[in-house]
């Protein structure tokens, strides 16, 4: 009997093992048959902004041509989600203009997105934005599932442009973790959002509802449908990560109502008179005037930006360029301004604006013209001429609006007769407006807006840094040596870096000489600062004799003959020794042709030759250093003299 029982037990065990092995084999066969679904990379167009896509991490394919300036980019390295996804990828260097795949990851919003020029794309600055993103090469991360189609924040998505289907009832898994995504059934009326978070409890399957048509729940508000307590909320996870739920996008609007008028891209400061002489009623008229101007301008990050400084005894910023990004917000801020009282020290206010207002910290964009509109009741109680000159040298276009100016009898009390003409850079009436009385001020709104937006006529925006053709004439003789030659090129790069370089602004060219001459690159070859700096790096050391006279003649023929008529012509010659040929006639010819010549001598250079080469007076145009490593000390002196000379030219 015992033997039978043992036999039966052995049979049962044997059957169990057979079934187990069969099951494992069957499972392996089924696993082999179940092929992993093929991942399809979604395609998007160049104008698709990251903020329109609700996925927090995804791979997309960009088309060619996204380097186009129509596709705006805000920031550098970390981009505001209002940016073009593909434009940002080109700017960052992940893609070139031929397109390709990129990996996009959303991150938290931040303040102070900095604009920069990189890889053929000019990104813009932005004071702050609620969501950011970063881009990298389009290589999938191990263990991360990426969506094959993208979900957009509204039904009017740009998905159709790229062949995508925007789906509101199905959300892609959130990448960034190897854990399985958790699908959350959303509250009534909201859009589905998927998220993974290993430290949060999963919601109950019955927590949501499939009912539709109800008002979406605001972020942070407890939903009755989710029960008590609300331990898990997709809104909380998204906000912590810097993301905004779709219902917030629809109610609070990810993008501003207007990006501003791009045809009037100026950085504008109003200096309003808050002195005691005005009185409350006229101060209110002044504020209404500002409001009307703000409404007419169409303020926004892609158009004009506006700030206000009030002055009396001393100036004070009411709000700066980055404080308000639309006309309505500016209007509301103006209404809150209260009068300071005191004197009418407009000169002190202009100095304050020049030194403090037009800075990156205060939202100055750099590429936009700087405009300061000074409003004066009667006349200033201090001098404005010197402060205005310094402002113009800094590239600030000054407009003066004088209301109820001094009568003939009152002019004897003025510190500075004709103060408005002394303040502006043109006395042709373009920069100064005279208003007979405060009740006529409203008539000035349209004329002023038209003038500040006419960037072609803003002569003061043409500064010493954006209005020249600069040709570098570089000594490549044997006495320089390879190491010192690289130091010379660094000096050339340091000088070039100070200028605003483009086809419309400053252009840079360079040639090298020994006994012979060689054009390294002309004025029309590179139109961006980065391209110019890279071209300077590529200049190779030649080695040979020192024929400086022939080099100057060559520069006039090969470089400056192609200079634009409206450009100042600047020649910056660097040499380390005495010339083997005559320099007098070529130098005189350069001066005769209007080429302003700076002569930089190093080590064995002859001071008498430097003085002959340099434009008169030589003390302002000829510089000498005893060794190559000290060349960097000359950079600020050259820049200062270039600007001083530019600003001393007749303006009227």
Swiss-Prot record:
<keyword id="KW-0524">Neurogenesis</keyword>
<dbReference type="InterPro" id="IPR004043">
    <property type="entry name" value="LCCL"/>
</dbReference>
<keyword id="KW-1015">Disulfide bond</keyword>
<keyword id="KW-0272">Extracellular matrix</keyword>
<feature type="region of interest" description="Disordered">
    <location>
        <begin position="196"/>
        <end position="231"/>
    </location>
</feature>
<feature type="compositionally biased region" description="Low complexity">
    <location>
        <begin position="145"/>
        <end position="158"/>
    </location>
</feature>
<dbReference type="InterPro" id="IPR002035">
    <property type="entry name" value="VWF_A"/>
</dbReference>
<dbReference type="InterPro" id="IPR036465">
    <property type="entry name" value="vWFA_dom_sf"/>
</dbReference>
<dbReference type="Pfam" id="PF03815">
    <property type="entry name" value="LCCL"/>
</dbReference>
<feature type="region of interest" description="Disordered">
    <location>
        <begin position="137"/>
        <end position="181"/>
    </location>
</feature>
<keyword id="KW-0732">Signal</keyword>
<dbReference type="InterPro" id="IPR050525">
    <property type="entry name" value="ECM_Assembly_Org"/>
</dbReference>
<comment type="function">
    <text>Promotes matrix assembly and cell adhesiveness. Plays a role in spinal cord formation by regulating the proliferation and differentiation of neural stem cells.</text>
</comment>
<dbReference type="GO" id="GO:0030198">
    <property type="term" value="P:extracellular matrix organization"/>
</dbReference>
<keyword id="KW-0677">Repeat</keyword>
<dbReference type="Pfam" id="PF00092">
    <property type="entry name" value="VWA"/>
</dbReference>
<feature type="domain" description="LCCL">
    <location>
        <begin position="40"/>
        <end position="133"/>
    </location>
</feature>
<keyword id="KW-0964">Secreted</keyword>
<feature type="compositionally biased region" description="Polar residues">
    <location>
        <begin position="196"/>
        <end position="212"/>
    </location>
</feature>
<feature type="domain" description="VWFA 1">
    <location>
        <begin position="267"/>
        <end position="452"/>
    </location>
</feature>
<dbReference type="GO" id="GO:0005614">
    <property type="term" value="C:interstitial matrix"/>
</dbReference>
<dbReference type="GO" id="GO:0010811">
    <property type="term" value="P:positive regulation of cell-substrate adhesion"/>
</dbReference>
<dbReference type="GO" id="GO:0021510">
    <property type="term" value="P:spinal cord development"/>
</dbReference>
<comment type="subunit">
    <text>Binds dermatan sulfate and chondroitin sulfate.</text>
</comment>
<dbReference type="GO" id="GO:0005576">
    <property type="term" value="C:extracellular region"/>
</dbReference>
<feature type="domain" description="VWFA 2">
    <location>
        <begin position="469"/>
        <end position="638"/>
    </location>
</feature>
<protein>
    <recommendedName>
        <fullName>Vitrin</fullName>
    </recommendedName>
</protein>
<keyword id="KW-0325">Glycoprotein</keyword>
<feature type="glycosylation site" description="N-linked (GlcNAc...) asparagine">
    <location>
        <position position="494"/>
    </location>
</feature>
<feature type="disulfide bond">
    <location>
        <begin position="66"/>
        <end position="86"/>
    </location>
</feature>
<dbReference type="InterPro" id="IPR036609">
    <property type="entry name" value="LCCL_sf"/>
</dbReference>
<feature type="disulfide bond">
    <location>
        <begin position="46"/>
        <end position="62"/>
    </location>
</feature>
<feature type="signal peptide">
    <location>
        <begin position="1"/>
        <end position="26"/>
    </location>
</feature>
